[in-house]
Regions:
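Short, mixed charged/polar active-site loops
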Residues: 27, 48-52, 84
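Short acidic, Gly/Pro-enriched loop/turn segments at secondary-structure junctions
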Residues: 45-49, 64-77
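Phosphoinositide-dependent membrane-docking surfaces
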Residues: 37-38, 51-68
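Short, compositionally biased strand/turn segments
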Residues: 28-47
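Canonical phosphoinositide-binding patch of PH/PH-like domains
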Residues: 81-99
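Residue-level detector of beta-strand structural context in well-folded domains
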Residues: 28, 53, 75-77
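Anionic N-terminal interaction surfaces
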Residues: 1-32, 94-107
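Active-site beta-strand termini and strand-to-loop segments that position acidic
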Residues: 33, 77-81
Length: 107
């Protein structure tokens, strides 16, 4: 099923990650809607299934960004809500995601 099948009525995607981001040792596309943060992936070759992690924006009470590593830096965003979601990837891809989440949470 495509992501659109999992969106709520009148829910609009405001940001989509350019490349997959790592969360819990799995790769996901990240979407920020006007209501939720959604991590979405299609898994399997023959028996396809959807893998979704979702957090309501109103439940998020903290967003943290950090970079580590030399010479190859890795960026991490920690989103604190009902649980903590730690997403990793290259800084050039993670920073725009951080700013998008931060602007939607502070909205």
């Amino acid at each position: 099923m495509p992501l659109s099948d999992f969106l709520l009525p009148m829910e609009n995607v405001k940001f989509r990650s350019e490349q997959d981001i790592e969360y819990s040792e799995k790769r996901y596309s990240v979407y920020v809607t006007d209501r939720r943060l959604i991590l979405y992936a299609r898994r399997g070759l023959v028996m396809r299934s959807d893998d979704i992690v979702s957090e309501k924006l109103e439940s998020i009470h903290g967003v943290k960004y950090r970079e580590a590593g030399f010479p190859f830096k890795t960026a991490t965003i920690s989103v604190v809500g009902t649980s903590t979601i730690d997403m990793k990837g290259p800084p050039s891809k993670i920073k725009p995601l951080f700013f998008s989440i931060q602007s939607m949470v502070n909205h």
